[in-house]
Amino acid sequence: MRILAIDTATEACSVALWNNGTINAHFELCPREHTQRILPMVQEILAASGASLNEIDALAFGRGPGSFTGVRIGIGIAQGLALGANLPMIGVSTLATMAQGAWRKTGATRVLAAIDARMGEVYWAEYQRDAQGVWQGEETEAVLKPERVGERLKQLSGEWATVGTGWSAWPDLAKECGLTLHDGEVSLPAAEDMLPIASQKLAAGETVAVEHAEPVYLRNEVAWKKLPGKE
């Protein structure tokens, strides 16, 4: 099985290839340079893996949430590549991707993901890894004010890992929440961590045709555009 993963939904730009169990990955912090970097990174990963695009079984893309511009860039480029090679596509949540990263780095199976969404809000989710290694919690994804996060936390108990830029942007996000929190060691999503999720989705037949690949913004785009200078 070969899966190519692409993510440009945040300040990071990353590409990874699952090549029959071997992973090759590249991750860069490159704000506002996604369009210049992503295709060269794809070419570098394919060359390093000795694979061509026509040998890929599916193309995974970071479907958001994240920067509107970044999410659109990633999906547009992924669609172009998938169309040219006639590949099925797999949308992967940026929040679930970070949860997978926390598991890879720390073994965490319960993860609170928060991405700074600007405008006084965070993109939020509570993910838990089940016995089959599948992340459950997509229904918890939302864009929330910090005080609403506090309300969500009061409904939880036990130990959780924290991931994402939302925690540094809002240091008091979990103030007096009563939970045991530890650092999941992930600030931004990486394509490498999309691959296990994408492989599960591919095995389950959860792919979409190129024309049906859609972003998940969690926020109304019109409301975002009312603020000048924001992506």
Swiss-Prot record:
One GO cellular component term noted in the UniProt record for this chain: cytosol
Keyword Manganese among UniProt keywords: no
Pfam families linked to this entry: TsaD (PF00814)
Subcellular location: Cytoplasm
InterPro entries named in the record: ATPase_NBD, Gcp-like_dom, T6A_TsaB
Record keywords, A-Z: Cytoplasm, tRNA processing
Keyword set includes tRNA processing: yes
Superkingdom classification of source: Bacteria
Location (main, coarse): cytoplasm
Gene Ontology biological-process annotations: tRNA threonylcarbamoyladenosine modification
Family: Belongs to the KAE1 / TsaD family. TsaB subfamily.
Function: Required for the formation of a threonylcarbamoyl group on adenosine at position 37 (t(6)A37) in tRNAs that read codons beginning with adenine. Is involved in the transfer of the threonylcarbamoyl moiety of threonylcarbamoyl-AMP (TC-AMP) to the N6 group of A37, together with TsaD and TsaE; this reaction does not require ATP in vitro. TsaB seems to play an indirect role in the t(6)A biosynthesis pathway, possibly in regulating the core enzymatic function of TsaD. Neither binds polyphosphates nor a wide range of nucleotides on its own. Does not show O-sialoglycoprotein endopeptidase activity.
Name the record gives this protein: tRNA threonylcarbamoyladenosine biosynthesis protein TsaB
Organism: Salmonella typhimurium (strain LT2 / SGSC1412 / ATCC 700720)
Gene, per the UniProt record: tsaB
